[in-house]
Amino acid sequence: MLLLELKKTNQTLETIHFIGIGGVGMSGIAEILHNLGYKVQGSDLSENYNTKRLEAYGIKIFVGHTPQNITNVSYVVVSSAINRNNPEVKEALERKIPIIRRAEMLAELMRLKCSVAVSGSHGKTTTTSLVACLFEAAGLHPTVINGGIINNRSTNAYLGSSNYLIAEADESDATFISIPSTIAIITNIDPEHLDYYKDFDTLINAFRSFITNLPFYGFAVCCIDHKIVRELVNNITERKVITYGIDSDDAHITAFNISTDITSSTFDVKISLPNVSGVTIIEKITIPTPGRHNILNSLAAISVGVELDFGIKAIKNGFNSFKGVKRRFTKVAEYNQASVIDDYAHHPEEIKATLSTAKNIANKQHGKVIAIFQPHRYSRMQHLFDDFMRCFDDADLLYITDVYAAGESPIEGISGQSLIDNIIKLKYHNQANFLAKLDDSLEVIMNKASPGDMIIMMGAGNISNFANELPQKFGNLS
């Protein structure tokens, strides 16, 4: 980055090319580099919200991957999803163009900043957004690189004016260990990305390194409601750790007097920090998003704000300004007085949290929960097949589509149909159905939706596109 800075100063800018620039992680870094004045371009297999947004900023976007796309580039940036068989990667190797991993480029952006890195199996994107809102309310105006679209800004990344940078740290391939952060947040740790880590212990050890790699003056923020995180924290003595939770009375920061509805959550906070006498209570914090898991995400942000002495007013103002994150329990349509929710949940624990929130709301409205789930990646489904069978308890009606491959090859015996077959066979759900086509969801909604129902469309694939097209589809029916 220092070399790039020197070249920028000398007006000898060279082009940085992003392969897979439409991904949430890649697009954010590309946008920040562009805003810093670097020459950026990229390619992706198809257009999406991110590519169109970047193109509107003046960033050149190629649809499709071909060697010709990198004719005049000096650096190529790739994520872990891009393999060496990619034609642009092959061309870069042939021409000896430096290939930089996404996490390395993120690390370079963070190196010269005071950085907050948010990691964990679930909740990273919302937590990153909440932390950013608190920094803004405290007048610190950070640079932010997130894994989802922040509704306040309609982007997943923006350049701030201060020396602070807040970033979502992806744990999928252990590169998050090398991110030079001052503050590290761990929301939870579940068996995920085992195709890379091979076993759960290796993943846990990576999170340990994430904390111990902090500078001595930094600190970690960890949710000890989660058993694995608690065990991890109990064995760390070389770094300062602030803990939070709802069910953990021994946590430094806890929530109580909790109430939720379809649009928000309200709660009080108790603060009891180590080596600080007395207890502080913050009353009636409200966030415009429902769910216990989002209260936990808020507690992570509060922990950072308290430790950095933002003050109660800034913390409350920060939450008041928060407008949520795209695809996190987002209402996209209504049909027959039933709400259609678009949600990114694609891991069993995320599904349970989302459906629990939906069930709580549906019960208050005398409705039912209709879950429509699109599995994401054959490898994830294979590793967590048993957990997927057990995670739909809060759905009154369950519909599962086939797997969104995300570039993976099929695995024998792993499919949406096989998941449904096993759920029925082992009696985990008595109202489970397979949808041969995602388009069949429209008929399900039309035939099953009743007033007060919560229709939850979940997954990390293209189910979101379908969900967001529903208002138009409903309009065409009239």
From Swiss-Prot:
Which NCBIfam families does its entry note? murC
What's the family? Belongs to the MurCDEF family.
Known pathway: Cell wall biogenesis; peptidoglycan biosynthesis
**Gene name of this polypeptide:** murC
Keyword check for 4Fe-4S, yes or no.
Answer: no
Give the protein name, as stated in the record.
UDP-N-acetylmuramate--L-alanine ligase
Could you say which EC number(s) this protein's record lists?
A: 6.3.2.8
Question: SUPFAM superfamilies, alphabetically?
Answer: MurCD N-terminal domain, MurD-like peptide ligases, catalytic domain, MurD-like peptide ligases, peptide-binding domain
Summarizing the function annotation, the protein's role is: Cell wall formation.
The record's section on Pfam families has:
Mur_ligase, Mur_ligase_C, Mur_ligase_M
One GO BP annotation of this record: peptidoglycan biosynthetic process
GO MF annotations for this entry? ATP binding; UDP-N-acetylmuramate-L-alanine ligase activity
Annotated GO CC locations: cytoplasm
